[in-house]
């Protein structure tokens, strides 16, 4: 029970840190941002490969965007407001490669977060993940765009 409370506290802190974020990064104009933390090291998860897909009319997943997390465990600039229209989005984090690079054999191959974007009008999405080799937790911060 105590470990669950600690995990929830960490995730809440992650969202607050993400919202506060460094100034001057342009994140307020970014409609989709990913933030990843390493729960083992207690630090940002650097160089995690992220792939974003959009569900097509034929129910297949079309590649939409990709990148790697920064030294802050963040990935900005995946898309623009013009391109990020309503639809089903899948964000995939390559956790296996991340852990293998640290010499750790993980349980999960990757983390997937699937959600309906912009179904209630334009929004900003921050997908946050807290990783360990045998578990992960995700949360999302959805907000109205700031002009």
Swiss-Prot record:
SUPFAM superfamilies: Transthyretin (synonym: prealbumin) (SSF49472). The modification 4-carboxyglutamate is found at residue 62. Glycans are attached at residue 118. InterPro entries: Thyroxine_BS (IPR023418), Transthyretin/HIU_hydrolase (IPR000895), Transthyretin/HIU_hydrolase_d (IPR023416), Transthyretin/HIU_hydrolase_sf (IPR036817), Transthyretin_CS (IPR023419). Detected in serum (at protein level). Detected in liver. Belongs to the transthyretin family. Thyroid hormone-binding protein. Probably transports thyroxine from the bloodstream to the brain. This is Transthyretin. The lineage of its organism: Eukaryota, Metazoa, Chordata, Craniata, Vertebrata. The gene is TTR.
């Amino acid at each position: 029970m105590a470990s669950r409370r600690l995990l929830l506290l960490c995730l809440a802190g992650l969202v607050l840190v993400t919202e506060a974020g460094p100034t001057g990064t342009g994140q307020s104009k970014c409609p989709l941002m990913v933030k990843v933390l390493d729960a083992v090291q207690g630090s940002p998860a650097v160089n995690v490969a992220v792939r974003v897909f959009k569900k097509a009319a034929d129910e297949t997943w079309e590649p939409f965007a990709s990148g790697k997390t920064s030294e802050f465990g963040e990935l900005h600039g995946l898309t623009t407001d013009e391109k990020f229209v309503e639809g089903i989005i899948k964000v995939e984090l390559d956790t296996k490669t991340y852990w293998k690079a640290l010499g750790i054999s993980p349980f999960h191959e990757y983390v997937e977060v699937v959600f309906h974007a912009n179904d209630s009008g334009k929004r900003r999405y921050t997908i946050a993940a807290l990783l360990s080799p045998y578990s992960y937790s995700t949360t999302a911060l959805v907000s109205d765009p700031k002009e």
